[in-house]
Amino acid sequence: MKFDIQNDFLGYHSEWNLGSPGGWDYQRITQNIGKAVWDRILRISDPGVDLDFLHPLLYPVYGFVDMLVAVHRSREGTAPGLIAVVAEEETLVDVTENINLAGHLSAVEGITGALMAPHELELCDGKVSYRGQPVSTIFMDFNSDILLDLHRKHDLTPALQAVREGRVVNPRGTEPINVKSMFEVFTGPLGKHFCEETVRRTPWTRRFGERSALGPDGQEIRDLIQYAYRNWDNLVLKPERGYSGMGVRVGGVNEDAGEAIELALSKGDYILQEKIPLNLWAEDNPAVDPVARSVVLERYQTDFRCLMGPGGLFGFLVRFGGVPTNVGSGGGVQPLAVLRSGMTVREAVERVNAAVMNIEYGDLREIVLDQEKMALDERFTYLLGPIRMAIRPRIITPGHLTALERYCRCMWTDSQVLEKMWLEGALDDYIGIEKEELEIARMQPWKGGPAVFASDGLFSFGAHPEDG
């Protein structure tokens, strides 16, 4: 069947997050601000492109909240109750997303949402409670390695009891398969057990170290370290566990292969991965240049996070920036819109870019300043400043939504296969997690139950540069 870029997408997932992925409320804020910016653009320079900013999948927080409430209802029926949002103490006043989540939960009839540190949980008459009120469900915004570290500093017996009682989302049983080495499972001999969709969107991946391996084309690699030296421009090194792009080294971007390889070997627990061509997950976006006092077209890398639960897609988080694109590494966020006009995504993007480029610098600068003010008003900040936000939306089609729903169903199903293989001992060689953490995982198996998962996609929906 001929590939149709209007109804399918190109690219690969760079990683999965089965632990405690975020972004579900940040995209809501981004959509609201992005729609306000878009309305301003239309009044000045209308590109003649009909875009939908209000599709439910562009607001993933609501599906996430519905899932948490459903978990509560499954335990407590129609009785009112408290859903706890548990986060590290130092983040409680700064992480807007968790503050907002507690508010969204409290807006549901009969539900109280409360944000707290894990050591604020207590046992009252043997029940996991917060300030004397029993807790029905917990969203825990950190992984089990952090839980274990905090338990060693505080007595987190109430939190661990909640794990045993199955009250914690995500279930701690996802943690052993929440490591980047799982991509070697997909791209190695065990790949036959998984969906073709998952396998073809997984870049070649191998745990890094002194070992032999099969290469991207099935060739025998006798010395993986030497292979990395010889082919560095086309490879990436990443910690098996990590976030915000910390410790990642990308061939061709980080040119010193020796530094990258020595870092990976000294730290340990790294993966070696095939680099996805940068142009495939790049797009050109208008921006203001305050130094030159001009409107410029800049090329950014993109990141398309799919957020899902047991019922399917919750929605997306769209990011842009350099390599990597994480906000913690200087990246930003981008609104998302569904194309309703009868044209290709490429034509729509070109029209929107041209319309924005035709706006006078002073007018566009004023729009950007208002955009930043709206971000500050929403406490949408990182290190005290507004999070960077693209001027124009990323554009997809209804056909892309269908393709992404299919892709996420495969990811969910294949995650269940991974957990089953882990419980059977088939993945022991791929998982380097300490014994106590594995014991926590065994307290609360996942088994396909309520959870929020994320896939970070380096995708093209048809607007990637053709000259890169």
Q: Which role does the model predict for each range below?
A:
Residues 1-468:
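Preference for protein termini
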